[in-house]
A protein has these predicted regions:
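Cleavable N-terminal export/targeting peptides
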Residues: 1-38, 284
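Short glycine/proline- and aromatic-enriched beta-strand/turn motifs that initiate or cap beta-hairpins
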Residues: 24-93
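Outer-membrane beta-barrel "beta-signal"
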Residues: 242, 272-284
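Residues that define the transmembrane beta-barrel architecture of outer-membrane proteins
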Residues: 57-65, 76, 118-126, 140, ...
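Transmembrane beta-barrel strands of outer-membrane/channel proteins
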Residues: 37-47, 80-88, 144-152, 170, ...
Length: 284
């Protein structure tokens, strides 16, 4: 509890300091402003362990699409990220038909039935980062701030199994200018506190779907509060950028993400993902 209280206090103080600087600073028409729009295609290698359904599922070289908007206004960095990832995990059940023994409760007889899994996995992330530069010169910039993220892990196998998360936490970014055309950046995000909705086992979304028909807002009552004791996650982003002109650049990068959501405690979800990305950026 002391660690959680310490993190809460530090995060609150950081937000207060950033907010005070926003409102205290006078408007200056000559301040530095820029907007960057980036689109990247990532090639993923990773896996996830959804223990409410299966032990381990993975897929290599699955595409991931990401759209970023980065706004630098004076001393502040605003970044909005939307990304989507889809795969059909490879396993024995998805590669070939499985024959299993079933029971007919009407006749009381057993019979054999063929089954082939159509398992698919989707991941959607929306994130907003706000950071203030604490160190800056002609070659490098260091930003520290916070982020708000919405994550959805969707798994479909004849019926949906959906995990939804809202979280806040600290974020930091480092930009280094190698020369006039080349630059390198690193960004790190950590969710500390949040709220998540996750079924206790696969196929137990009947109540969720019932609430969706009756009143969508009732779904929020099915969730749990998250912190370091039941959610651990980190997101790292490395990117090299080459400027072709003042308004266009291309880049290469690598992202790494780890997440563990222990709700329910006995059946956590693990998500480990690394991906190489190619990026095109337009700057205004």
């Amino acid at each position: 509890m002391k660690k959680i209280f310490t993190f809460t206090l530090l995060f609150a103080l950081l937000n207060i300091c950033v907010s005070n600087k926003i409102f205290a600073r006078e408007s200056n028409p000559d301040e530095n402003r820029s907007v960057e729009l980036s689109f990247s295609i990532n090639w993923t290698f990773g896996c996830y362990k959804e223990t409410t359904f299966s032990n381990l599922s993975q897929d290599l070289l699955a595409p991931r699409f990401q759209l970023d908007t980065k706004i630098i206004s004076g001393d502040f960095l605003h970044k909005i990220t939307a990304d989507y990832f889809f795969c059909r995990p490879k396993s024995a059940m998805t590669q070939t038909a499985v024959v299993y023994k079933n029971f007919d409760p009407i006749t009381g007889e057993t019979y054999y039935e063929g089954f082939k899994s159509n398992l698919s996995f989707h991941r959607i992330r929306l994130q907003y980062d706000l950071a203030n530069d604490i160190l800056k010169n002609d070659r490098f910039e260091l930003y520290v701030g916070g982020n708000f993220a919405c994550n959805a892990f969707l798994q479909f196998e004849h019926y949906p199994s959906i995990t939804g998360l809202l979280s806040i936490g600290p974020t930091s970014a480092f930009n280094y200018k190698l020369n006039e055309r080349n630059s390198f950046s690193v960004m790190c995000s950590l969710p500390l506190f949040g709220y998540g909705i996750r079924p206790p086992y696969a196929g137990c979304d009947a109540q969720l779907m019932k609430y969706a028909e009756e009143s969508f807002m009732k779904i929020l009552t099915l969730g749990s509060f998250l912190s370091l004791h039941n959610q651990q996650a980190v997101l790292l982003d490395f990117e090299y950028k080459l400027s072709a002109s003042d308004h266009f650049s291309v880049g290469l990068g690598f992202d790494f993400e780890y997440a563990r959501i222990a709700v329910p405690k006995e059946k956590p979800l693990y998500y480990v993902d690394g991906n190489f990305k190619t990026t095109a950026t337009v700057k205004f």
